């Protein structure tokens, strides 16, 4: 299941393709392809355990695209920029370690950002992306929705990485759904304020 999303405020030929996989059996292989900079595996592979919501991924994709469009990438490509955009700090290595794929990753969010470039006037198609993922990600596809992501979210990690521990007002919220909504908003705020 691959969702294709056109973000507001970016050119219409720049698209974001997102898939969620559960029970990934070959995370080590996928991780090694990223480390080898294999162009066929130029995706943002995000450990789903640190994803609080769809908005978190889409905000990171928007930021990565904005940086790409302004020619200010700090990382090798727009996909690695997306992974670092998830982090509340500017430490690139820390962002890769916390938010990117590792050999131990079980649930995986895969993002492919497509746009015309000097080397390819026509970006890779949605069907080609879906086929490549089906052949190379050994996991069970799931829908890219907040409900599906919630199954994978490790709130202990999210709270630690975004420094949400020890907030008495947050801990005092009795309604679990409301508490998660507030944490999601705090995560988005931390991402937006990075580097300010």
Regions found by a protein language model. Name each.
Residues 96-196:
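Glycine-rich, aromatic-bearing surface loops/beta-hairpins
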């Amino acid at each position: 299941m691959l969702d294709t999303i056109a973000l507001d405020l970016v050119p219409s030929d720049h698209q974001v393709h997102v898939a969620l996989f559960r029970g990934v059996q070959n995370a080590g292989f996928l991780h090694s392809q990223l480390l080898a900079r294999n162009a066929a595996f130029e995706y943002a592979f995000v450990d789903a355990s640190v994803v609080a919501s769809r908005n978190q991924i889409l905000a990171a994709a928007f930021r990565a695209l904005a940086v790409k469009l302004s020619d200010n990438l700090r990382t090798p490509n727009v996909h690695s920029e997306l992974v670092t955009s998830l982090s509340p700090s500017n430490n690139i290595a820390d962002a890769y370690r916390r938010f990117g794929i590792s050999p131990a990753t079980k649930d995986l969010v895969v993002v492919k950002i497509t746009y015309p470039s000097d080397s390819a006037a026509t970006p890779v198609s949605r069907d080609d992306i879906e086929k490549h993922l089906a052949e190379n990600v050994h996991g069970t596809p799931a829908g890219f929705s907040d409900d599906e992501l919630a199954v994978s979210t490790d709130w202990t990690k999210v709270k630690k990485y975004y420094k949400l521990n020890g907030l008495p007002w947050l801990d005092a919220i009795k309604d679990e759904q409301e508490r998660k909504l507030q944490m999601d908003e705090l995560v988005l705020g931390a991402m937006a304020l990075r580097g300010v």
